[in-house]
Regions:
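Carbohydrate-binding/catalytic loop surfaces
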Residues: 1-15, 57-88, 140-163
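A structural signal for alpha-helical segments
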Residues: 5, 29-36, 87, 94, ...
């Protein structure tokens, strides 16, 4: 992501890297993860903080904002005649769940490795991210908005919200997770 213009069209891909490292940690341990991948993890997080190609940026509320009508920025977008089929400009639910997971994971590894400089620079962000996420994405209907943009919350029920329940570091309380899982399960059964 850092310095790679082609990666800017896949705002969630660098964040899945952290999830992959979480799986790898079970095999090789946290110390080796930080030793071999710590710098790459920091670079990815810093690239979001700086912003990427004028399309992806970390906002003051701790959430990642992405916007482009020409380039599909998430896994579910396709382009026809140069336009996104499913535009999701703004804060996407799965991207911000992945973002929170990535930051919390990096903070844990850095703390265990004694990287106090990194910890000091990033330690306050997760609380702000979680508060903003819950304020913007949680809907009274018991599920999460798919994305939140300039026009408000997109309340279409899409399976993207399940990512917020399936990562090692979550921003949702247990009751909300159960409601999200129930909603996604009902959606899946309806469309089979």
């Amino acid at each position: 992501f850092a310095g790679n213009a082609s990666a800017a069209a896949a705002e969630d891909a660098p964040l899945w890297f952290f999830w992959t490292l979480q799986r790898l940690e079970a095999q090789i341990g946290a110390k080796k993860i930080w030793k071999h991948y710590g710098e790459a993890m920091k670079q990815v997080l810093e690239s979001y903080k700086r912003g990427v190609a004028g399309r992806v940026a970390l906002n003051d509320n701790g959430l990642v904002w992405a916007s482009s009508d020409e380039v599909p920025l998430t896994w579910m977008n396709s382009v026809i005649d140069g336009r996104s089929v499913t535009p999701r400009n703004g804060y996407q639910v799965e991207v911000n769940a992945l973002w929170y997971n990535a930051v919390r994971y990096a903070l844990r590894l850095a703390g265990e490795a004694g990287d106090t400089k990194f910890v000091k620079a990033w330690e306050k962000l997760p609380e702000r991210t979680a508060a903003s996420f819950n304020e913007l994405f949680r809907l009274p209907k018991g599920y999460l908005a798919d994305c939140v943009g300039c026009d408000g919350a997109n309340t279409d029920i899409r399976p993207n919200m399940i990512v917020a329940c399936g990562l090692p570091y979550k921003m949702l309380d247990e009751q909300t997770q159960l409601e999200v899982i129930r909603t996604v399960r009902q959606l899946s059964l309806i469309h089979i």
